[in-house]
């Protein structure tokens, strides 16, 4: 799944698909509401594309808007960052929630539905709302290195609806599989969507559609696509290694009895598992910096707790969202994302803490609170 997601995202990246969505959304919303357009674009793009790649592709558009409107670049960059952070943390097929869902053995369809709800609220609060405050409080000019960049040649970009359609393929198939499992009237087509909605199959179909619709149809040869997809697998080694470590941690906790010790301690505190999952993820995130490591380690601990297998699919999906939220908060000096944002935006460490770190915390806390509310109905 991680490998297919990486290849899918790489094709979307090199074809200009991310830029297509950004340019189209900004045109639809207009300059005054462009911050909302960038937030939505970031959310959509970060599902198949890695956070850092999405940021590097889209940040020139945020800078061009800041230059055009003479506003602080943070007015547009923060919403973009919030959207990317939300898509990266909450909504499959991005690797983090997929890995957590796998470790907790929860249906990806439920994870997508809960993730979308959590993500929308988190993007609004941490994106346009916080971005507007940052834009007024901190004037950050457009970096000189990008101030004179050429405008995007829209004639070379693929169709907006083609991009959206391809991105929606895995999401729709996985959700339909989940719906067919709980709606008796759809029992006749359930076997079909059970196959097509299998995450690996759904993502494989999306990747094949991207290869044809965004690759071969736009002049790329199979050899060029092979190079793009092979290169996209380079970052996945660390993700798979971290996943394996998280799985080992889960079984160490489970078979050593530590899972029961933690479970008994939690029971005495009367903490719901959703809240516990968030707290564990926050502690790991602050300690190690990496959101993916925090997600995997927190999921390993939560998966080893007694009674976790008896929870409903919806509650487990809320737990996945809680882990995602906790793994997003408090980005600071030990997080590579902190330094990437500082470098690209051209701000010092103090300003990065006051803008980016607070934005990440708003994303995580808002997403968690929405998941907590949903869990009351699970």
Residue ranges: model-predicted function:
Residues 21, 97-108, 180-194, 222-223, ...:
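Membrane-interface helix termini and inter-helical loops of multi-pass transporters
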Residues 13-18, 28-32, 65-76, 102-109, ...:
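Juxtamembrane helix-boundary/capping and inter-helix hinge elements in multi-pass membrane proteins
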Residues 6-7, 19-24, 53-65, 94-104, ...:
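Re-entrant/interfacial helical elements at transmembrane boundaries that shape
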Residues 25-40, 68-76, 199-201, 233-239, ...:
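Membrane-interfacial loop-to-helix junctions in multi-pass transporters
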Residues 113-227:
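Long, contiguous bundles of hydrophobic transmembrane helices that form the permeation core
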Residues 69-71, 106-155, 325-378:
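Juxtamembrane and boundary regions of transmembrane helices in multi-pass small-molecule transporters
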Residues 1-19, 195-257:
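Core transmembrane alpha-helical segments of multi-pass membrane transporters/permeases
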